[in-house]
Amino acid sequence: MDTIASLFSFITWPVSWVIVQFHTVYGAIFGPDTGWAWGLSIVSLVILIRICLIPLFVKQIKATRGMQTLQPEMKKIQERYKNDKQRQSEEMMKLYKETGTNPLSSCLPILAQSPFFFALYHVLNGIASGDTIGKINQPLLESAQKAHIFGAPLAAKFTDGASKVESLGASLTDVRVITAVMIVLMSASQFFTQRQLMTKNVDTSVKTPFMQQQKMLMYVFPVMFAVFGINFPVGVLVYWLTTNVWTMGQQMYVIRNNPTPGSKAQASYLERLHKSVTEHGRTRRRGEKAIVKAIVAKGRDRNEAERKFINGLNKAGLAAQADGNVVKNDAAVAVQSEDGSTVTTTAQPKRQQPKRQSKSQRQAKPAGETEPKTSLTKSDEPQDAEPAGKQDAKPAAGAKKPAQKSGGGGRSKAQSGQRKGPQRPKSPSKK
């Protein structure tokens, strides 16, 4: 570990300078030789580093989600070129280039803070050995050696012997109890962070090798922390524990406010967002607009939780816009079906359905109602002027016809030897 720390000696001076500046502030409050002054200086160093790494953390989230999305395509490439490793690598790089994904982006925060971690280890190791290093001069060195956190010196390790611990002004029991508790807390925080990531923030609709890797890391990382933690000074354990707690809180914030699409966390988030939007009638924050904008842009590729969210807004008389805003939409209601297609129905007044009548009601006509003429009756034939007496006799003859046809169901029947339908008038020459 000392050899690795020496490789990052170029950053030892900046790290020691930052610690000294924070120690000056906290020393004026708690006293320069107290463990609180030195411990809080290390914690403040962690917070400062992690704030500077927030842009890299955002890039890590995007890269991780991009890798999750590409897992099905990567699996197809591996199966297609399983006997040609070179072609497989070429296709993988081509896929990364087309989608703009960099697999190393997910490791950027860890790689970026590694130099600070080893530089701090180098500084604390110098304090334990009594050597001035970086910005820490002899008076600050003596002050740091006197500082204890819950009875354990900053430079003490779990593996140190009784003589070395006594030279730092502490007992071996106190050092081992404090370091063991910190190692357990460090491993537990790492396990909880990975478990939250696996159970809530992973797309459950796609089973990929990436999920198996994350599940394996959930158990491997805590064991690694426990193994390496016994060789780290108390000050480094404070740094590492603070880093894990920060990561856990940061991950919980991301899971709650910007979850992975298709995960359980996204379903919970969209339920809360739907409740907020229906109460206020709009999206209130920039993050909410970004989520709605991404869902609208997906179109038919929305997952079940996203379709449920869009349909819920439409049923509430709201419509999600392409810019992420939500507006009232009383004219149309769009509902997305299971296959992703959107069906829009316009709100129109209900058409009045005619009252159904039975066969006997249709046949029984009122006495004063005239039966409508059809194309099968003789009334379609051209009529010449006839005497008045003959015209008066026709209604009487026509009045008897309904009684004669009552057994036939009111259906117009053609006479025997006569073709159905309208008849051609007889030629005058045949009369």
UniProtKB/Swiss-Prot annotation:
**Highest taxon, organism lineage:** Bacteria
Biased composition regions of type Basic residues, renumbered to the chain = 421-431
Instruction: Tell me the compartments it is located in.
Output: Cell membrane
Q: Which UniProt keywords apply?
A: Cell membrane, Chaperone, Membrane, Protein transport, Transmembrane, Transmembrane helix, Transport
**Which parts of the chain span the membrane according to its record?**
10-30, 38-58, 220-240
Q: How does it sit in the membrane?
A: Multi-pass membrane protein
Q: Where is the composition biased (Low complexity)?
A: 394-405
Name a GO CC annotation attached to this entry. plasma membrane
Which GO molecular function annotations are given, in alphabetical order?
membrane insertase activity
* Protein's UniProt keywords contain RNA-binding: no
**What processes in GO biological process is this protein linked to?**
protein insertion into membrane; protein transport
Q: Where is this region: Disordered?
A: 337-431
How this chain assembles, per its entry, is: Interacts with the Sec translocase complex via SecD. Specifically interacts with transmembrane segments of nascent integral membrane proteins during membrane integration.
Report the function annotation for this chain: Required for the insertion and/or proper folding and/or complex formation of integral membrane proteins into the membrane. Involved in integration of membrane proteins that insert both dependently and independently of the Sec translocase complex, as well as at least some lipoproteins. Aids folding of multispanning membrane proteins.
- Extract the PANTHER family matched here: CYTOCHROME C OXIDASE ASSEMBLY PROTEIN COX18, MITOCHONDRIAL (PTHR12428:SF65), OXA1 (PTHR12428)
The UniProt entry's sequence similarity note says:
Belongs to the OXA1/ALB3/YidC family. Type 1 subfamily.
Q: What is this protein called?
A: Membrane protein insertase YidC
Q: Which organism is it from?
A: Streptomyces coelicolor (strain ATCC BAA-471 / A3(2) / M145)
Organismal lineage: Bacteria, Bacillati, Actinomycetota, Actinomycetes, Kitasatosporales
